[in-house]
Amino acid sequence: MDQQSSDEDADTDFDTQIIIQQSLLDAYKPELTGRTPEDERSQSFSSEDYKKIVEAIETVKYSSYPRPSKEDALASFAKYHPAFDEANGSGWLPLHKAAVQLNKNILEITLNASKPSAWEQTTRNGETPLFLAVSSSLLENAHFLLLNGCDPNAKNFEGNSPLLTAVLKDSYDMATLLINHGANVNLRCANERTALHEAAKLGRQDMVKLMLSSGANPDARSSYGFTPLALAAQGGHTETMQLLLQKGRADVHSQASDSSSVLLEAVRGGDPDSVSLLLEYGADANIPKSSGHLPIHVAADKGHFLALKVLVPVTDIAAIKRSGISPLHCAAAGAHPQCLDLLIRAGFDVNFMLDQRVRKHYDDQRKSALYFAVSNGDLSSVKLLLSAGALPNQDPVNCLQIALRMGNYELINLLLRHGANVNYFCRVNPLHFPSALQYTLKDEVMLRMLLNYGYDTERCFDCPHGERVHRCCTFEGWTSTVIKDTMFCEVITLSWLQHLSGKVVRVMLDYVDQVQICSKLKAVLEKQKLWPEIHVILTNPRSLQHLCRLKIRKCMGRLRLRCPVFMSFLPLPNLLKAYVLYKEYDLYGQGSSTGT
C-alpha cells in the first residue's frame, strides 16, 4: 500500500509539473498557441467520461441518418450524470454539442441525461442550447427544445435573442416556430433593437409581415432613436417601408436622438423611390437634424442626384437660410458637379455664405461654395460656380491662394479670368508686397500669370532704405506671433532663395517702368548670371513701346484687362491688343506646361 501511494504521489507531482510547464509556455509564447488557458484546463481536467460523451455526439454531428451503435453508446453513458454537467473551456456542455448536430435522437438522449438546470445553462458567449440550435438553423432540434420548455427569449451576452437570430439567418420557419412557442416580438435586444428592427433593416418583407401580424410595435425606438421604418429607409428598402406604413401605420414623422428624420435617413441611403414614398405619406423635407442639416443638404453632399431632384421642389429657401448652409456648399464639398449644376439651374444663390455658427467649425473660416470646390481642386465645379456668377474674393483665405498653393495652372487661370484678386494680402504676417508672389518664385509660368493679370510689381521694388545700408534683420517676422511689414528684398535675399533672385527680378522688369533697386537686393543680384542683362535694363531708358503698354494698362485697370468683352470693343488692332495683354509672355496660354 505504501509503495502504491508513493507511485500515485509521484504521478500526481509529475502531472502537476507538466501543467505548470504548459502554463508557462502559454504565458510567454501566446503567438505559438491558439488555445486559451481555459481550453488547457479543460483539456487537462475533463473527465474521460466527458470526452467519450462528446466524441459520441460529434461523430454523428454531420449526419442526420441514424447510427444505432453510436446512439446506443451515448445512451450507455447516460448513467454518468456528472459527466453531462461538465463544460469545456468555452463553457460548452454535452447538451450544447448535441444542440448543433443534425440527429435529433442524439439531442433527446443528451437532454434526458442532463439535469434540468443544464437546459438553460449558457456557454461563455451566453448561448443556451436553444440559441445554438437556432443559430445553426436546426428546426427540429429547436422544436424539440421548445417542447421541453426551453426559454425562447434567453439572450446571449451580445444581447441578441433567438428570434432576432432567426431573422438574421433569414429563417422564416424558425421565427414562426419561436413566436408560436412564446417568443416576445417586442423583446429589446442589442442597441435596444427588436426583431422588427432587424427585419426592416435587411428588407425582409416576409419577416416584417410576420412580426407585424404577431403584434410587433412598428414605432419601437433603438438606443439611437431609430424606428424600423428609419432603418428600412437607410437601406432603401421601399417595399418594406410600404409595408410598415400601410399595415403597421408607422410614424413617418419620427426622429432619431439627433433629430434626424426618417426622410433624412432615406436620403442618406440615396434611393429616390424611398424618398418619394415618404413624401407621399406626408414627410416634411424642412425638418433639420440637430446639426442644422436638411435632407437636401445630405443629398447634395452624398451626390444622390435623383433624390436631390425630388427634394428641390419641396424644400423651402427659408429653411435653408435658417440652417446657415446652402446645398451648394454640400455639393461643392462632396465634389458632385452634376448636383451642383442641378441646384444652380434651380436658382440657388452661388454667393450664399456660410453662417458664422457653421464657419467656426473650419480653421480657415471659409464662407463660399467656391472655396470648397477650389480646395478640392474640382475644376468642373469651379467652372460651374464661376460661370453662374460666384465671386472669387469672398473668403478670409483667398481662393487664388489655395490654387497657387496647389500649383494648378488651369485652376489659377480660371480664377484670374473671373476676377480673382492677384493683389490680396494674407491676414497673418503680411508682406509689404501682395502675398500671392511667394507661391510663384520657383515657377515662371505662375509668376507671369500673376503679372499679366495686374500684380502690383512696383511694391516689390519699394524699399525705404534705398542705397543706404540695411539694418541687421532678424527672422521674428516669419513666426506666427509677430506681425511685420517684410520687404521683397528681405525675402528674396534669404540664403535659400538667393539663387532665384536673378530670374524673378528679370521677369518683373518686363512689367514696370524705370525702377531703383536697393543696396541689399543689388548686392545679391550682382552674383547672379542674369545681372548683366538686369543692369542694362536698370541703367537705360525703357522703350516708348513698353511705356505706352504700361500707360494703357494703367488707364484700363485690372478688371477691364481681364474682361474679353471689353477688350473686343477696344478700338485697337488685334496685334496691339495682344501686346497690351502681354500675350508674348503668356507661357500658360502658349502651352509650355500644364501644372499639377
Curated annotation (Swiss-Prot):
Keywords: ANK repeat, Repeat. Belongs to the ankyrin SOCS box (ASB) family. The keyword Repeat applies. Residues 531-586 form the SOCS box domain. ANK repeats lie at residues 90-119, 125-154, 158-187, 191-220, 224-254, 258-287, 291-320, 323-352, 365-394, 395-424, 426-459. One of its GO terms (biological process) is intracellular signal transduction. This is Ankyrin repeat and SOCS box protein 14. InterPro entries: Ankyrin_rpt, Ankyrin_rpt-contain_sf, Multifunctional_ANK_Repeat, SOCS_box, SOCS_box-like_dom_sf. Interacts with MAPRE2; this interaction promotes MAPRE2 degradation. Pfam families: Ank_2, SOCS_box. The SOCS box domain mediates the interaction with the Elongin BC complex, an adapter module in different E3 ubiquitin-protein ligase complexes. Pathway: Protein modification; protein ubiquitination. It comes from Rattus norvegicus. May be a substrate-recognition component of a SCF-like ECS (Elongin-Cullin-SOCS-box protein) E3 ubiquitin-protein ligase complex which mediates the ubiquitination and subsequent proteasomal degradation of target proteins. Plays a role in the inhibition of cardiomyocyte nuclear proliferation by mediating the ubiquitination and degradation of MAPRE2. The gene is Asb14.
